[in-house]
């Protein structure tokens, strides 16, 4: 209220439009992207538990990496990024991965620079979701672009969309997919009790 004019730009304002209107008295306008998106959303895979989900993620990532894709795996916290790293140690110890979280954020620029290279596997917390521009190599572009995995659903869909927005930027191709376990916290909190018993 102290500012005569306020404005901003983001790819995820639509989800927050009610809050922006109610709290700040602001409206939003959708602006079409400069280039048509080439992103392919591969949907959602659902698993009975987190252990099964992590095992399949590692198996899928190993295949994608061997085929020349660059993969970004997004998670909510340092703890879960370490759990995913442990799953790679268990099921694919020969596959090198990079971890980008608050513990090693000093290395962020160099990790991001390598994340778009052929076969790269980057495990990252939400710090990689907003504003990070992963440049992909021509060989990755030729294999379909950056592949983003939402390995842990966030409480707010806007954060997941920010992560998805790391792929298929500026006319590049890219793919995204979500992996969900029925026993992870966000599912347990929001899934109706009757469905949890199925």
Residue spans of the language-model regions?
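Structural motif
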Residues: 26-29, 71, 120-122, 146-148, ...
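Short, exposed interaction patches on small structured surface elements
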Residues: 25-44, 177-198
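Conserved nucleotide-binding/hydrolysis micro-motifs of P-loop NTPases
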Residues: 5-6, 13-15, 34-38, 77-80, ...
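Structural recognition of the conserved hydrophobic beta-strand(s) that form the central parallel beta-sheet
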Residues: 6-9, 121-125, 148-151
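Conserved SF2 helicase motif VI
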Residues: 136-139, 145-149, 153-177, 191-197
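Conserved motor-coupling elements within RecA-like helicase/translocase cores
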Residues: 63-68, 78-146
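A contiguous, basic/glycine-rich beta-loop/short-helix subdomain that forms a polymer-engagement track
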Residues: 1-57, 102, 110-114, 132, ...
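Residue-level signature of catalytic and energy-coupling elements of molecular machines
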Residues: 10, 73, 123, 165
């Amino acid at each position: 209220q102290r500012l005569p004019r306020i404005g901003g730009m983001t790819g995820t304002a639509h989800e927050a439009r009610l809050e922006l209107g109610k709290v700040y008295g602001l409206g939003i306008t959708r602006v079409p992207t400069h280039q048509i998106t080439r992103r392919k959303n591969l949907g959602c895979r659902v698993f009975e538990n987190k252990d099964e989900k992590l095992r399949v993620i590692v198996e899928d990532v190993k295949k994608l990496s061997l085929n020349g894709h660059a993969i970004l795996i997004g998670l909510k916290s340092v703890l879960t990024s370490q759990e995913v790293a442990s799953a790679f140690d268990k099921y694919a110890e020969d596959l090198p991965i990079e971890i980008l979280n608050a513990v090693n954020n000093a290395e962020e620029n160099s990790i991001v620079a390598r994340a778009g290279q052929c076969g790269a596997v980057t495990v990252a917390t939400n710090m990689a979701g907003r504003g990070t521009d992963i440049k992909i190599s021509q060989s990755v572009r030729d294999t379909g672009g950056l592949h983003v995995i939402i390995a842990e659903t966030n409480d707010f869909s806007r954060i997941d969309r920010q992560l998805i927005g790391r792929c298929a930027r500026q006319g590049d191709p890219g793919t995204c997919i979500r992996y969900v376990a029925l026993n992870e916290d966000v599912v347990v909190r929001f899934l109706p009790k009757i469905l949890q018993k199925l």
